[in-house]
Amino acid sequence: MLRGLPEATVIRDPSDWAPFLRDESHVRGVAPLAVVKPHGPSALRELVRRAKAEGFGLVPRGAGTGKAGGCVPTDRTVVVDFSAWPGEIVVSPQDLCLHAPASALLRDVKAAAETHRLFYPPDPNSWESCALGGTLATNAGGPNACKYGMTRHWVLSLDALLEDGEIHTFGISSVKANAGPALGQLFIGSEGIFGFILGATLRLTPLPREFVTLLLPVKHWEDLLDLPGRLCGAGFLPSAFEFFDPAVLAELRAHGPDEARRLPGEALAILEFDERGCTSESFLEGLLDLLGPVADGLEVAADVRQRQGIWAVRRMTSVFLQERHPGKVSEDIVVPRSRLREFFEGLDQLRIPAVTYGHLGDGNLHVNLLAAGATEPAHLDHQLVELFRLALSLGGTLSGEHGIGLAKRDAFLALSDPAHLHTLRALKQALDPQNIFNPGKVI
């Protein structure tokens, strides 16, 4: 299989394929035909040619940190592992941008920007280990999306492999580019079904010079639900607004690390602000006035060490719950800030055994069904569909940042607007008529 492929390492031994059959979701893939690590464009050109001639598909893979099964192999596919794709991170401070290959780790992208006192905001929970290409293909989010938006808001241009086997660049290194539709945006969040992302030019902004990190414990957890809308309505836009519901907080206190065992409240929020003046007394006084009695237990991180400790607990929550409940299923639905209370009231009425934490500030909630592994599959599917229907009924969506992949494909197809699906299929047919790019995913 794939003999004589130029500029590539081909892994043919099935005993070496295990790491490539999964990501961080519950989805498991089938054995691929091979795993290929391309080192240059001639490898991709030949891969595309052979895929079209021999009738197999190509599955892109970055660091394997996805949450929806988007990078796992399906029938008659070759995994294309971009971890060794060449390229350097090049920062242009004058243009407030940088260019990086898909193989670059997001932590290195962010660090390169920060050496010039610049900031690349997207910060998914896996930011220290995920690859840039994967964050582009899934339109990754994270806590900072509350203020700064998703990955797609920070992409100026994109390098993509198309079905002709060539690498094409869409966009320029400027915030202004209006010569027709922004075709590069089609690839962001497409999970590789239109073509493969090989690199991108990313927009940067000056690095925030001030931070204030706040712990907000509450005696009655419903008191948190109106706060995102109240804060935004009063002109307080946090750069992050995270939360733990009572069940998650209880698990952390009972079984988590020492930092988690000391967390106060029935439920808890983490708020962070990074605007100029946010550390001033007047800013904090205005915030306290707005919060009112809810802020009785408010704690301000005293220094960088305490701030890092707070965020360490938040960042480890997903792994902690996975270790405690190996069969759990984690969803990432979204509802508008103004309808958070309605969502949780509806969730109670559905009687779905779930715990929640995540990005309260932008309505992106990680709803975890801890007993999913012990639940009859048909009943679990019913619970998930009911959860998705609830989010959709409130003007939300079934995925805020993880994507569709294989994990949510059936629900996505069942619940989406037919016109939406028709348009996606038309785009797929136009850009990938032989269905070689990540077949079986999303649609």
Spell out what each predicted region is:
Residues M1-R49, T65-L96, N125, V248-D258, ...:
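N-terminal flexible segment immediately upstream of the FAD-binding catalytic core
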Residues R12-W17, L21-D23, P206, V212-E386, ...:
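C-terminal substrate-recognition/cap domain of FAD-linked oxidoreductases
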Residues G87-V91, L98-E242, F437:
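FAD-binding subdomain of flavoenzyme oxidoreductases
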Residues E166, R409-I443:
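Activity-critical C-terminal alpha-helical subdomain
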Residues T397-I404, P439-G440:
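Short acidic/histidine-rich active-site segments
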